[in-house]
Amino acid sequence: EAVSSDSGRTIQTMGIILQELGLTGEIPYRYDKRIREWCFGSFDGAYDGDLFMGVLPRVFKVDDFHQLSLMELAEGIVEVDTTGWAESWRALSSRIKEGFEAIAKELEAAGGGNAIVVSHGMTITTLIYLIDPKAVEELVLDNGSVTVLAYEDGAFHIEKIGDMSYRKVGAKLLEGGHDE
């Protein structure tokens, strides 16, 4: 099964993945809005630096937003959002947990197996935090990184976080003049 958030960039990424793996049309693919990126309210679409390097550190009187917990970040975004669209930590973490658990439970009910899921950096970081808070200390996920989770007996287990090895192999192939 393949699942992505319903945002354009995850749909595009999933299309590339399925095409490269030869799975386009071969496995079911659907969207799930619960695994969307965090809603940054009035900062959605803005330059990340404005929010993370400017506004939030000033609101919390810290030098670096990395000093803030995910909960503090979420609540800070709610505080500075002028649209009322930003989600509280409770709403955000519940949405993300429900979305990924639904995918896992559906797969489990079908007899198990693997799913390809394309989501977003802050969303994946939040899910990892909900599984193991210590795992996100100092964590910054690169775009296109691969995180592998297992789901067994009603719980997620982290197998790999932010793996970039396949991109390094691809970069070497491109350097060698190969198109594929």
Which sequence ranges carry the predicted segments?
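Phosphate-coordination/substrate-recognition cap region in phosphate-metabolizing enzymes
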Residues: 1-65
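Short beta-strand scaffold positions
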Residues: 4-5, 94, 118-119
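Short glycine/proline- and acidic residue-enriched helix-loop micro-motifs
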Residues: 57-91
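Domain-level recognition of soluble alpha/beta enzyme cores
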Residues: 70-71, 79, 132-157
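Glycine-rich phosphate-binding loop signature in dinucleotide/nucleotide-binding domains
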Residues: 103-113
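Generic beta-sheet signal
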Residues: 111-121
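Active-site metal-binding loops of divalent metal-dependent hydrolases
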Residues: 121-122, 164
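Acidic, His/Gly-rich catalytic cores of divalent-metal-dependent hydrolytic chemistry
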Residues: 159-180
